[in-house]
Amino acid sequence: MNAEIIAVGTELLLGQIANTNAQFLSEKLASIGINVYYHTVVGDNNKRLQQAIEVAEERADMLIFTGGLGPTKDDLTKETIASSLAEELVYDEKALASIGDYFKRTGREFTENNKKQALVLDGATVFANDHGMAPGMGLNKNGKVYILLPGPPKEMKPMYVSYVEPFLRNFTTGENIYSRVLRFFGIGESQLEVKVQDLIDGQTNPTIAPLANDGEVTLRLTAKHQNVDEAEKLIQHVEDLILERVGEFFYGYDQEFLHYKAIELLKKKGLTLACAESLTGGLFGNQVTESAGVSSVFKGGVICYHNDVKQHVLHVPEEVLSTDGAVSKECARYLAENVKELLKADIGISFTGVAGPDASEHKEPGTVFVGLAIKDEPTVVFPLNLSGSRQQIRERSAKYGFYHLYKKLEEI
């Protein structure tokens, strides 16, 4: 079955809010074997919404609407669909009572326009709104399935999970879709794709979808099967083939982000970390502290943006700063070693470089050095040559820091 998601709301077209509902629904629908081929966004306008419905009916078996179920005059979704299908709108008594109870509890007047939220298409299956007022609904008519959902994600998402997905399973073949995301760092999308090109060209089930995002590459493996164990076998076979070729760049699955993986390894090995940040200005430390319980492994950091701090707090020799410069391998080495000693940590990591947009110390933007000092190990400095905006260079530098930290921790 093929679906189209139609998001209704002028605020979406104006860019005032992001259409996160479509992303959520697409992922959920794919997991139960419903293909989403189109996303449509239309404003709060009866005529244009009617046109969107007519177009969607020509190319989709299922039309899923989000938004436009509220109490105001510009909430037109139910009325427009009712007119299009020649269906009446009737009050759902449970929804009407629930909305009335809310106004009674809050001491507010239950006005006619708020009663409008309890209207549903005659004959539709009603989805209770446990986190808001307007119920959702589903109607099978003329060989098409129409699903109407509230716009606020805090209402739509739990409604989908509790009521909509069980309803939609009545229209699926029983063949589910299972996905696994492989995460890679330290290799570009084009390089990775070349190494697995024959697998991509020959893909059937599972499929392989590469995606580059903010300095890393993911491969989404997607298999269709009625049985989850068989789907897992299909995915595992292709994963094994991929990792035989590019396993050195692989670091995790799905939502296992690089900084979380590095912190997990620190905890596992019982080692502590300190950071010295010039270029990144605290970005690395900020990401470290996103992990719960990180105080057991993170001693702290020094933001050493000015050379005075590098020299007088972290004891980078004046001759290094005047001869090699702050953006240098030698400076990165001293920063990593000395922050480790200063904060009595097992590991020190440092970041120094040129974020841009202008050159500094006759070095171009994107020139970066990441230092890594680990007890009982020789200090290593990783030179980087990055591209992008000032913020992208800073963020990618921090990510490379986590990557090199993770890889070194795997070795020891």
Swiss-Prot record:
It comes from the Bacteria. InterPro entries: CinA, CinA-like_C, CinA_C, CinA_KH, Competence-induced_CinA, MoaB/Mog-like_dom_sf, MoaB/Mog_dom. PANTHER family: NICOTINAMIDE-NUCLEOTIDE AMIDOHYDROLASE PNCC, NMN AMIDOHYDROLASE-LIKE PROTEIN YFAY. HAMAP family: CinA_B (MF_00226_B). Belongs to the CinA family. This is Putative competence-damage inducible protein.
